[in-house]
Amino acid sequence: MQVKKIKKRKKVNFFQKNNIKYIDYKDVELLKKFISPNGQILPRRITGTSLKDQRQLALAIKRARQMALLPYVIE
């Protein structure tokens, strides 16, 4: 049997690519891209965001949840 080699594509930081400096908690459509189907915040290794952007993203998602713009759990 021959083993297939899987090429991993390089993850690109979405916020640097689109020149987004500030992640707004009121931009719900943007934040939904970084939430799993269960409602959890996706980690950096999956999204490809930088450390600084991931911190801002997590803070924005938590603020949106607190303001009831995003649900805590999706059923």
UniProtKB/Swiss-Prot annotation:
Highest taxon of the source?
Bacteria
Which Pfam family, an example, fits this chain?
Ribosomal_S18
Gene Ontology cellular-component terms for this entry are: cytosolic small ribosomal subunit
Note the InterPro entries from the entry: Ribosomal_bS18, Ribosomal_bS18_sf
- Give a yes or no for keyword rRNA-binding in this entry: yes
Q: What this chain does, per the record?
A: Binds as a heterodimer with protein bS6 to the central domain of the 16S rRNA, where it helps stabilize the platform of the 30S subunit.
For this entry, the protein name equals Small ribosomal subunit protein bS18
The source organism is Mycoplasma capricolum subsp. capricolum (strain California kid / ATCC 27343 / NCTC 10154)
- Which lineage? Bacteria, Bacillati, Mycoplasmatota, Mollicutes, Mycoplasmataceae
User: Encoded by which gene?
Assistant: rpsR
